[in-house]
A protein has these predicted regions:
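Active-site beta3 strand of CheY-like receiver
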Residues: 64-70
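Short hydrophobic/Thr-rich beta-strand motif most characteristic of the beta2 strand and flanking loop
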Residues: 45-52, 60
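Receiver (REC) domain active-site loop signature in two-component systems and cognate sites
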Residues: 75
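Charged docking surfaces used in two-component/phosphorelay signaling
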Residues: 35-43
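Alpha4 helix (beta4-alpha4-beta5 surface) of REC/receiver domains from two-component response regulators
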Residues: 82, 104-121, 128-136
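Short amphipathic alpha-helix used as the core "switch/output" element in two-component signaling
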Residues: 59, 81-94
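Acidic catalytic/metal-coordinating carboxylates
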Residues: 53-56, 67, 79-85
């Protein structure tokens, strides 16, 4: 009677009750970070769905239909920047705001801007700043296209 191992990968898809603030898909391979982001957003009235990596994000994004997606950069199977590129190239998710929550290098910030990431938040992050950035991205006008000044502001969050 030893310990039983669970099969890998174990889906982390989870869902809470609907809310009025918006639905956020949180993608991070670190379970503690996923929970930290989830709890902070749920306390502010957001509905949160989680995924353990970019591949899982792409599997569930069309069922979840989030108002915003947070992505870590370094993840197994499919990293955050490649996931962002695939989300931007899909007409069904091209307009969903993307927030990178990661300890990014300048090169990763530039690569993120190139694939259409909307904002960056450095780890460790201030929970109030997380909520502020998520709210501002969800409340931005639909179809808002970043201008040159917006790219500099987005990079400033890294």
């Amino acid at each position: 009677m030893g310990k039983r191992r669970t099969r890998w990968p174990v889906p982390t898809y989870s869902r809470v009750v609907p809310s009025t603030s918006g639905r956020v898909l949180v993608v991070d391979d670190n379970k503690v970070i996923r929970q930290l982001i989830r709890v902070n957003l749920e306390l502010e009235g957001f509905e949160v769905v989680t995924a353990a990596d970019g591949a899982e994000c792409l599997e569930v994004v069309h069922q979840v239909r989030p108002d915003l997606i947070t992505l870590d950069v370094v993840m197994p199977r499919l990293n955050g920047l490649r996931t962002a590129g695939r989300l931007r190239s899909d007409p069904r998710t091209a307009g969903v705001p993307l927030l990178i929550v990661s300890a990014c290098t300048q090169h990763e910030v530039e690569s993120g801007l190139d694939v259409g990431v909307d904002a960056f938040l450095a780890k460790p992050f201030d929970p109030q700043e997380l909520v502020r950035v998520v709210r501002s991205l969800i409340d931005a006008p639909v179809g808002h296209v970043r201008g040159p000044g917006d790219a500099e502001a987005a990079a400033g969050h890294a």
